[in-house]
């Protein structure tokens, strides 16, 4: 019984292809080695970008805390402004010639209590246990944000002196205006920082998922496939040799 020449040629064809595939796999491995150096550089850059975005994100968190401080301060000043309005009303009443001394004494008593409540509002306005009416520095995405809020003096307030009350109200208005400007500035900083963080994360992802990394994965997958093909071809060759040996016996 004779072995078909066509079968032999087919087996040799598979074996040759398997050999070529193995050679190609070796070339691919060499290519991976060449690429790995670039990937290491990319990875270092990606790590730097990740660190940068993490720093920016923490700065954004700090900036939100700064806004929280300003919002607490503004809420307190809203209450204080209402108290100042009441003091102004009492001051106008004091100028009523029809009031007797007892009635004026009652107005002064109320005014004293209002002044005490104003002081309490300044002293009890806290964020995370810290009084907001002081100087605070917050490291944010693009630098440092400083909240410089000092409590207003109330010792000179008197319903017998309306000018002292109107001056106090003017100072309140200026302080609230500064708070509003501060919130707007920090919000703008947050928006810019968030965009920078997004850009850093996008750049990091591009480096970690670039074509070169994809090629490395492709090389590994092809190498496995080609070795599998070589194994199948070798197995076929071994089976063929076994059949030949049996026929020659």
From Swiss-Prot:
GO terms for cellular component: bacterial-type flagellum; extracellular region. It is found in: Secreted. Gene3D superfamilies: f41 fragment of flagellin, N-terminal domain. GO terms for molecular function: structural molecule activity. Pfam families: Flagellin_N. Keywords: Secreted. Its main location: secreted. Coiled coil: none annotated. Interacts with FliS. Might play a role in virulence. This is Secreted flagellin C. The gene is flaC.
